Regions:
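Hydrophobic alpha-helical transmembrane segments and their immediate juxtamembrane helical boundaries
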Residues: 165-181
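Surface-exposed, charged secondary-structure patches
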Residues: 56-112
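Sec-dependent N-terminal signal peptides
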Residues: 4-14
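Short, well-ordered alpha-helical segments enriched in acidic and aromatic residues
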Residues: 38-63
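Short beta-strand edge/turn micro-motifs at domain boundaries
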Residues: 18-22, 102-165
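Short, low-complexity N-terminal intrinsically disordered segments enriched in polar/charged residues
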Residues: 17-41, 145
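Hydrophobic membrane-targeting alpha-helices
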Residues: 12-17, 178-179
């Protein structure tokens, strides 16, 4: 019995931790899921999310991947990944011809879609080229300026509040104190 107890206690030390979620761009569902999953706060890994974008340097692909998610969030578009096809040979048959593509929101945001290139699915070149304009339509010009001013360390959380929010609150309190002094 004592040996079993030692085995149970020591077994976790020898096991290798693995990512249960990996980058998968084999079908429309996997591509969109990979993109959104790796941009969530609890699983944030923008390098992996950027793998859903083809033909850009990693730094640019990361920025584009983040902006795609921000546009979807800013428009209030919830992506129901369970409705996205898992067929790697999915064809969009809307229109006169069929293409290997999947449009996330055909009526509300037809510019954002994934397409099959080779045997993998990526966000389309049209999506990538139009995302800057879509972002500008959704967010005012000063939002991007503020995002560039706040360093990555400003997004660390303390007691459930991001550091930049805490600093902003302290600045407001200080201003309020001096105004009403």
């Amino acid at each position: 019995m004592k040996n079993y107890l030692w085995c149970l206690l020591l077994l976790p030390m020898f096991s290798i931790a693995q990512d249960s979620i990996r980058v998968d761009i084999s079908n429309p569902h996997a591509t969109v899921y990979t993109h959104l999953y790796f941009l969530q706060s609890d699983s944030f890994d923008p390098q992996k999310a950027a793998k859903t974008i083809l033909g850009l340097p990693e730094e640019q692909a990361i920025k584009k991947a983040i902006k795609i998610k921000q546009v979807l969030d800013g428009k209030g578009l919830y992506v129901d990944v369970n409705k996205i096809p898992v067929n790697p040979n999915h064809k969009d048959t809307i229109g006169y011809s069929s293409y290997f593509k999947y449009v996330l929101f055909p009526q509300r945001m037809p510019q954002i879609y994934v397409e099959k290139i080779g045997d993998k699915w990526y966000y389309s070149s049209e999506t990538i080229s139009k995302i800057e304009n879509l972002y500008k339509e959704v967010y005012p010009w000063y939002v991007q300026k503020l995002e560039n001013l706040i360093p990555v360390s400003g997004h660390k959380k303390i007691l459930g509040i991001e550091l930049w929010q805490f600093i902003g609150f302290l600045i407001l309190l200080t201003l309020g104190y001096f105004i009403f002094l």
